[in-house]
Amino acid sequence: LGYLGTCPTNIGTGLR
């Protein structure tokens, strides 16, 4: 879901 920096623009929870 983009929590561990996997998706910076997924849900706003990624760290790129």
Curated annotation (Swiss-Prot):
Chemical reaction(s) catalysed: taurocyamine + ATP = N-phosphotaurocyamine + ADP + H(+)
Q: Its Enzyme Commission number?
A: 2.7.3.4
Report keywords, A-Z: ATP-binding, Kinase, Nucleotide-binding, Transferase
The Phosphagen kinase C-terminal domain, residue ranges? 1-16
Q: List the disulfide bonds.
A: none
**Superkingdom per UniProt:** Eukaryota
Q: What InterPro entries does the annotation carry? A: ATP-guanido_PTrfase_AS (IPR022415), ATP-guanido_PTrfase_cat (IPR022414), Gln_synth/guanido_kin_cat_dom (IPR014746)
Tell me yes or no: is Kinase among this UniProt entry's keywords.
yes
Q: What are the GO MF terms of this UniProt record?
A: ATP binding; taurocyamine kinase activity
> Which of the seven top EC classes does this enzyme belong to?
transferase
What family is this? Belongs to the ATP:guanido phosphotransferase family.
Q: Protein name, please?
A: Taurocyamine kinase
Q: Could you tell me which species this protein originates from?
A: Arenicola marina
